[in-house]
Each structure stands twice: as structure tokens, then as C-alpha cells.
Amino acid sequence: MKPSPRTPDFSPYLDFDRAQWRELRNSMPQVLTQKEVIELRGIGENIDLAEVAEVYLPLSRLIHLQVAARQQLTAATETFLGTSPSISVPFVIGVAGSVAVGKSTTARLLQVLLQRWNSHPRVDLVTTDGFLYPGAELIRRGLMSRKGFPESYDQRALLRFVTDVKSGKLEVNAPVYSHTAYDRVPGEFTTVRQPDILIVEGLNVLQTGPTLMVSDLFDFSVYVDARTEDIEKWYIDRFLKLRDTAFRRPGAHFSHYADMADPESIAVARELWQSINLPNLVENILPTRVRASLVLKKGSDHLVERVRMRKI
């Protein structure tokens, strides 16, 4: 029996609970192992094979169908114009959401799952972290305390990158960011070579503006959502785990936090959340949720409990 999503009157969304959404998997086989899922997890996340089967396999099926529809539309346009098939136009997916909500894990899972479809095996993933202005430039502009806010990104470079990929350019380079050094890696790039699908993951990728924005180039978009108080808890928990791991690496930008006791670490993390990440979420990220093609709503256990899909 097909699921019947709850659809509020005059809402542009179809609203599924987890049981309804998992039925849309439509007998798709599980293509990941537990080992692969563990490797794809973010810090502090509980994602397992059940989450993949019930949430991400249906989502990968939906995107697969949309990719096929986009290819048919391209073919129809070529028929109308009487032109020969041109270079395949990559299908571009945006993945947005707050810091610590799990959007990076969602993007990695989608990359791996979509690669398993024979019709679009080349799936590239780029994060917008590499398009943050270098640390020296942020200092020059007085933006170090606004890192992660829209103005801290080289929006022109990001737009040019996605435009070049979508236009079929043979090779396009994206800057690489180091979370250890908390800065771009000079001279290091990720090269994208005419993928079937490009996933662009970042805090502010769904933002709009008076001129063309990267979100205008997306064929599909996902917003990873959760209650603000849950995200704050996850952020603090992640900070404590990073204090014991990444902050201790040689050259770590945040090495001065590595030897803090729990009470002091929690106080620092809460201050960072309340002064930087929460304002960015409220002012810039959360307002873009309405633009997403699909919203994954997580519960306090970090697992998806509801899915909202745009009808139009």
C-alpha cells in the first residue's frame, strides 16, 4: 500500500513521517555495508544501515528519477532545436543546514549512493568551505569573527565554479580547506571533470540575492533541519570530541583548547554557539529552508524523523 503523506491545505509541501517515507524505497536493495556507513558518519552521529535504508535509499531513488527526467528534458530541447546531443549537463544538488546538524554526512551518503546507479556513476562532492576567503583576507576585511556568514565567502568564485561545471567545462578546480589549519590550503585544489552529478554542500548555499546566486543553478536541494536546542547540544558535544582529537594535531588552529577541562570547554563552545553559529543560523541559514526541494527533519537522537518534499 502506497503511503499517504499529510498535506496541509494550501501547503507547497508533502509531509511524510519516517514510516511513510521508507515505503518509497520501492524494494531498492541495500548497497552499503555497515563498515562503509561508519566511515561516512560525522562526529557524534548515530546513522546506521536502518537510517540508510529508510531515509537515504528513498531519497537517492527520488534524485535518480529527477536526473532521468532532466536528461529527457534536455533531449526534448535538442529535438526541438534539431541539434545533435551535446555534452551532458551535470545535475547539480545543493545540501544546506546549520553547523553540526549533519549536512556533510548527508552529502557524503548521497554521493556514494548516487554513484551506485549505472546511469550516473560520476558524482563529485564539493564543500563551500574552500570558497571562504583565506584567513589573511578575512583579517584584512575585519571578518574573522564572521567566518561562516555569507560575507565571508568568495561568492563570485563559487558561482563561477558551479557555472563552469554546469556549462560542461572539461576541468574545473575548487580550493581545498583544512579544518585543522582553519584556512584554505595554498595551491591545493579539488579537480572536477564533467561529472554526471555535482553535490555542493555548505551553510549558505540556498541563499538568494539581487543577482544570480549559486542556488539558482541547483536542480535539486536538501535542507537538513533540527530543533535549535538539539543542534546546540550536538555542537557542544562535537566541540568536546574535537578537543580530544583534531585540536591535538600538529598545527591545529584550535590547539589552545586541547587541554581545557570539560566545564571550561563547554562554556567556550556555548559562547561560540551563541555569539557566532546561532546568529548565523537564525539570520541567514534557517530563512533559506523554504527554498529547499526537500527537508530532512531530525529528532534529538540525530536521526531523521520526518521528510518534507516540495510539490512545486
UniProtKB/Swiss-Prot annotation:
Keyword Cytoplasm: yes
Entry's EC annotation: 2.7.1.33
Keyword annotations from UniProtKB, A to Z: ATP-binding, Coenzyme A biosynthesis, Cytoplasm, Kinase, Nucleotide-binding, Transferase
Highest taxon in the source lineage: Bacteria
GO biological process: coenzyme A biosynthetic process
Binding site for ATP: 97-104
Pathway in which this enzyme or protein is active: Cofactor biosynthesis; coenzyme A biosynthesis; CoA from (R)-pantothenate: step 1/5
UniProt enzyme class: transferase
Catalytic reactions of this protein: (R)-pantothenate + ATP = (R)-4'-phosphopantothenate + ADP + H(+)
InterPro entries: P-loop_NTPase (IPR027417), PanK (IPR004566), PRK/URK (IPR006083)
GO CC, one annotated term: cytoplasm
UniProt cross-references to SUPFAM superfamilies, sorted A to Z: P-loop containing nucleoside triphosphate hydrolases
Compartmental location: Cytoplasm
Molecular function, one GO term: ATP binding
Family of this protein: Belongs to the prokaryotic pantothenate kinase family.
Protein name: Pantothenate kinase
Organism of origin: Corynebacterium glutamicum (strain ATCC 13032 / DSM 20300 / JCM 1318 / BCRC 11384 / CCUG 27702 / LMG 3730 / NBRC 12168 / NCIMB 10025 / NRRL B-2784 / 534)
Gene expressing this chain: coaA
